[in-house]
């Protein structure tokens, strides 16, 4: 049985580039990994986590969804489980903004024009993640406020352009949420 995603993971899945391999870093329970693998829209789906326990849960989720044969699970720290050019999108959901940018900093190949799309759902400090992305040459190609379990999350997609920007406080706080109808209650 295919797992049900909450609103934030559903929004993240919608921002993954179709037709290209994808990695779900910090896959935890493997729900997003399973939904991506079952969709048939990606030639390769990789679920990775730092600890064996979550990977065992992810394996069980994939087995229950009937798509274990369409995903690959890897044990490792952040993006060290990937090689440059291996995926077109990387999902980083459920970790803090600081952890997100620390993961990105450890993989310089991500900061290259034409590199992978980063799909991020920071658990905390989304405004600081926006600032970090802009100050390090990334452009936000999507930025959506999503409510799940009674709280608001920022679901973002960024691609490296090399163009460094110094954003305002308001840009960091709200991003592009003014473009989305659900943005009214976001801040």
PLM segments and residue spans:
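Conserved class I S-adenosyl-L-methionine
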Residues: 19-28
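Class I S-adenosyl-L-methionine
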Residues: 2-7, 80, 86, 98-187
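Short helix-capping segments at alpha-helix termini
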Residues: 39-41, 63-69, 110-113
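Short SAM/SAH-binding signature in class I
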Residues: 86-94
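Conserved SAM-binding loop of SAM-dependent methyltransferases across substrates and taxa
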Residues: 29-42
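S-adenosyl-L-methionine
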Residues: 1-20, 34, 52, 56-84
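Conserved SAM-binding motif I beta-strand of class I
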Residues: 44-49
